C-alpha cells in the first residue's frame, strides 16, 4: 500500500505517517526495556552494566546499518514522487546488490574487531567477557538487521507506514518471549538476550521481504532493470553512506564518552544504562517524526514543491515541541517506577544516579526534536553529506565531554553530554537547512526558465 504525500494537509499526512512509527518505536523501546529488565533482574548488575557498556559500540555499527538503509530509500522515494516507476525499480534492484555487499563486509569486520574495541574503551575486567559475548552475537546478526531495515525503509519510501509497524510488533513480542525462554529457562545469560534480538530481527526481515514480494508488484523489476548499475549504485551510496556515517560518527563520540564513564566503575555504568534506557523510552520515538519528514521532503522534492516542504517542517516542529514537553512531564512522574524495573530497591545510589541522567536528558528534548526534524528533512532533500556534518558536531561534543569534563566533573558530565551534543548539532543544522532551501529554489527556478 503506497501513499502520495505531495497532496493534502501536511499536518494530517505527517501525523498519519509518524504516529504508527511512534507506536512502533514505543513498542520497540518497550521490548528494549524488557530485554534490559530481564538481564538486570535475572542475570545481575554486572550483566546489566556489560550490556550498557557496549551501547555506544552497538549504535556505532547498527546506526550505520540503519542509516544506509534509510539513505538507499531516498532515491526510491524521489522517483515514486516523480511517478518514474522504471527508475524506481532500478534503484530498488541496486539497493539489493549493495545491501548484500555491506552485510558481508560489516559482519566480518565487526566480529573481528570486537574484543580490541572493548579493551580500548576501558571496559571493566569484571564485565568485559559478558560484554564481548553479547555484542559479538549482535554483530553476527547484522545481515538480518540490514534486511529488516532495508525492507522497512523501502515500504516507508512508498508511503506505507503500517506494514513496518506490524512486522516490528511481531519482532518485539517474539523478542520478549525468547528473552524469557533463553534467560529464565535455559539460563543462557547475556548471550541469550543477544540471540533473542538477532532471531527476532531475522523473522521480521524475512517476513517483510516476503510481504513486499507478494504485495508490491510495482517493485518487481525486469531482467534489464535488475542489472547492477554503477550510476545507480553511486547515487544510492551518495545518499546511504553519508547517512550511515552520520550515525556512526555520532556514535564515535558516544564510544569515547563510554570509555570515560567505564573508568568510573561498573556501578556508574549500571546507573547510566538504566537511566539512558528509561530516557530513550520516550526520546527515541521523536525519530519517527524525522523519518516521516524524510519521506515527505523526498516526495515533494520529486514533485518540485519546496513551499510544501517548508509547511511540513513548521508542522513537524510544532508536533515535536508538544511531544517533547509531554515526554518530560511523564518522565518526571514515572522516573522512579521505570528505574525500579531494572534495579533492586536496595541499590539506592545507583537509582539516584539514574534519576539524574533521566532529568538532564529529558529537560532538553526540544532541541533534540529540532535537531531530528532539520536533519531528516535535509537528508530527504538530497543533502545527506551536509547532514553528516551535524553528526560530526555531536561526535566532537561528546568526545570533548569524555576527554575533558568527565575527569573533572565525574558522572554529572556524562549526564549532560547528550544535551551538549544536541545543541552543537542544532547550531549547524538550522542555518544549513535555510542554505539548502535557497540553493534548491534557485536550481528549480533555473530549470523552469530552461523549460
Each language-model region and where it sits:
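Transmembrane helical elements of multi-pass membrane transporters/channels
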Residues: 16-35, 137, 148, 171, ...
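Helix-terminus/linker motif at the lipid-water interface of multi-pass membrane proteins
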Residues: 26, 30-48, 118-125, 181-188, ...
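N-terminal transmembrane alpha-helices
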Residues: 5-42, 56-71, 75, 100-107, ...
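Hydrophobic transmembrane alpha-helices of multi-pass small-molecule transporters
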Residues: 60-63, 175-180, 205-209, 281-284, ...
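Short alpha-helical transmembrane segments in multi-pass integral membrane proteins
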Residues: 1-18, 76-141, 185-241, 297-364, ...
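Transmembrane alpha-helix boundary and packing residues in multipass membrane permease domains
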Residues: 21, 25, 37, 74, ...
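Short runs within selected transmembrane alpha-helices of multi-pass transporters and secretion channels
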Residues: 69, 137-156, 164-172, 193-208, ...
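Small-residue-rich hydrophobic transmembrane alpha-helices
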Residues: 48-108, 145-164, 258, 271-335, ...
